[in-house]
Swiss-Prot record:
Capsid protein self-assembles to form an icosahedral capsid with a T=1 symmetry, about 22 nm in diameter, and consisting of 60 copies of size variants of the capsid proteins, which differ in the N-terminushe capsid encapsulates the genomic ssDNA. Capsid proteins are responsible for the attachment to host cell receptors. This attachment induces virion internalization predominantly through clathrin-dependent endocytosis. It comes from Aedes albopictus densovirus (isolate Boublik/1994). The lineage of its organism: Viruses, Monodnaviria, Shotokuvirae, Cossaviricota, Quintoviricetes. The keyword Transmembrane helix does not apply. GO terms for biological process: clathrin-dependent endocytosis of virus by host cell; symbiont entry into host cell via permeabilization of host membrane; virion attachment to host cell. The gene is VP. This is Capsid protein VP1/VP2.
Length: 355
């Protein structure tokens, strides 16, 4: 039969046999679920009762991409460079505005920010590729004339401070970039080297680091932010050390709270949320410690760095007005920030999960 039902004859007349799993098999307006039914006859379908327009969970997945060619120069200072991936601006090329207007993945992010209620930060990816290594050395037989040699066999070091907490300053836009700061410790190979886990990256190879961001609970979302705009350089990636206040250089609290005015009513929303701590150790790019006649060999690495930031934008529902937006904004939380003066980013290598 063309219908969803079948006809059988058992000698006592005709009976109708129905399917057993809801839909037309359970009759009009009935079924195994609690959803309301809509439609007619055997083609009846389920409908979520409190979301008639099915727009309350509309999301758009987007990846913000950047690619930079970097010059890690250790001629004058052999200390490791700090990769400040804990800053939100690192992922949006905030530190390098060159041709940023032509980066369509950033432009799409800005457009989605304008129509999104909140954002879920999923994960970030950082890929390094070494395409050239040179070494500065003294010319043979001289004491003050230098030259450059290609070092095709020399690897670059990537290191994590995953043994104890570290930090770095965040007082300028430039500090969100990978070439702005070097450590104050002497090297990765000194008496304190046990603080770092080191990896070697050969030339013509790629190394990708994946960072899983702090996930919010209870339907909370992060508030949309233009991570390419220079005035937002104090904002950090989702982390559970709490909101960093103006009154102290570094305030760490188990609770994140804020007071923000929304909508024309002037009503104030207050949000409090408990989250588990998340590990974001400080990351470094370094050269090896190899003695020579000038102290230590001085290398220079040309590196291609690519980043991918995976975001999920939660769109405003249809027929959103000031009254209900104020209610929904109670589910959005500002990204953590450092203080306006003497801002410090804490790089915690510990993860404590109490679940």
């Amino acid at each position: 039969m063309a219908d969803s039902t079948t006809m059988e004859h058992d000698g006592r007349g005709t009976k109708r046999k129905r399917e057993a799993d809801g839909g037309s098999g359970q009759g009009v307006g009935k079924g195994n679920s609690n959803a309301v039914k809509e439609g007619y006859g055997p083609n009846i379908t389920e409908m979520v009762p409190r979301n008639i327009f099915n727009k309350g969970n509309h999301t758009i997945y987007h990846v913000v991409k950047t690619q930079k060619y970097l010059d890690f120069n250790y001629v004058t200072n052999q200390n490791p460079y700090i990769i400040p991936y804990q800053t939100a601006g690192f992922w949006g090329s905030m530190w390098d505005q060159t041709d940023i207007g032509n980066n369509q993945s950033i432009n799409i992010m800005k457009a989605l920010n304008a129509v999104a209620l909140g954002v879920t930060w999923i994960k970030g990816e950082i890929t390094f590729e070494v395409y050239s290594v040179t070494r500065q050395r003294l010319l043979t037989g001289t004491t003050n004339q230098t030259t450059w040699d290609f070092e095709t066999s020399q690897n670059m070091f990537i290191a994590d401070a995953d043994r104890e907490p570290e930090n770095f300053n965040l007082e300028t836009v430039a500090a969100t970039g990978p070439l702005a700061q070097q450590t104050t410790q002497t090297l990765l190979f000194n008496s304190h080297n046990d603080r770092y886990t080191k990896y070697e990256l050969p030339q013509r190879n790629q190394y990708t680091r994946e960072i899983n961001f702090q996930q919010l609970t209870n339907n909370y979302m992060w508030r949309p932010l233009d991570i390419s705009k220079e005035t937002n350089f104090r904002s950090l990636i989702p982390m559970s050390e709490g909101v960093y206040t103006k009154s102290e250089n570094l305030r760490q609290t188990e609770f994140t709270y804020e007071t923000t005015t929304y909508a024309t009513s002037g009503a104030t929303t207050r949000q409090t949320l408990f989250r588990n701590r998340t590990s974001y150790p400080r990351m470094h790019i370094a050269q090896p410690q190899v003695p020579d006649e000038t102290g230590f060999m001085k290398f220079r690495y040309q590196v291609r760095m690519s980043t991918k930031l995976h975001l999920n934008f939660h769109m405003y529902p249809d027929y959103a007005t000031n009254n209900n937006l104020e209610y929904m904004h109670r589910q959005t939380i500002l990204l953590p920030q450092v203080a306006e003066t003497n801002g410090i980013v804490a790089c915690m290598p510990y993860e404590i999960n109490t679940q």
